[in-house]
Amino acid sequence: MAGHSKWANTRHRKAAQDAKRGKIFTKIIRELVTAAKLGGGDPDANPRLRAAVDKALANNMTRDTLNRAIARGVGGDEDSNMETIIYEGYGPGGTAIMIECLSDNRNRTVAEVRHAFSKCGGNLGTDGSVAYLFSKKGVISFEKGDEDTIMEAALEAGAEDVVTYDDGAIDVYTAWEEMGKVRDALEEAGLKADSAEVSMIPSTKADMDAETAPKLLRLIDMLEDCDDVQEVYHNGEISDEVAATL
């Protein structure tokens, strides 16, 4: 998994993402409600809920807000009548893309996703067309840190792998169900991560050039603007040199 860390690939998009914070909160609340309905309201016994809580806190959601969302899910709120839908497709430059949605209307959701692909030079694929290129993992990220210290603590806590990148960033990979436990162990060792999330990790990367990179980012933005889309995963790799031109 050599290459540039997500810090290099996403830093230039931070301002645009911050502007979407209101929509992000809505999507996180929807996931909290659904996770609590399906697996109960205890994050320690519900890995999906724990991941949603971690994401909520990472985005500075208040405890009151997330606790209300969990209570709605446990209580059978109407917003909890959602189903998870995964769409797969190909983006600019042959990138493999997976889109995780929460929806109460499949027809509406697939129409919005297909529209985004068609506008940005991509194609919506069939089930299984790119899923084999991704593995569901927990990713605990440090923008900077001592590699040996983090590696020792992470592996002792049950992490699967620790990767250090050229820019000094470090990612700790875990089984997705174990991410919360490993993160807690790292914090107890005095190692506070910059982020912790469940992600779909690609086994191969597709290098983006100055022509395909902006097209890929436009597609990602269009997909993320869809109300039903929770997460967009892809295997596009944008180098520092290309990112500097965007």
Swiss-Prot record:
Recorded superkingdom: Bacteria
SUPFAM superfamilies cross-referenced by the UniProt entry: YebC-like (SSF75625)
Pfam family, one: TACO1_YebC_N
Sample GO molecular function, one term: DNA binding
Location(s), subcellular: Cytoplasm
Major location (coarse): cytoplasm
Signal sequence, start to end: none
UniProt entry tagged with the keyword Protein biosynthesis: no
Keywords for this protein: Cytoplasm, DNA-binding, Transcription, Transcription regulation
InterPro entries assigned: Integrase-like_N, TACO1_YebC-like_2nd/3rd_dom, TACO1_YebC_N, Transcrip_reg_TACO1-like, Transcrip_reg_TACO1-like_dom3, YebC-like
Gene Ontology annotations of biological process type: regulation of DNA-templated transcription
GO cellular component: cytosol
Region (Disordered): 1-20
Keyword Ribonucleoprotein: no
UniProt-listed PANTHER family: TRANSCRIPTIONAL REGULATORY PROTEIN YEBC-RELATED, TRANSLATIONAL ACTIVATOR OF CYTOCHROME C OXIDASE 1
Family that this chain belongs to: Belongs to the TACO1 family.
Protein name: Probable transcriptional regulatory protein YebC
Source organism: Salmonella choleraesuis (strain SC-B67)
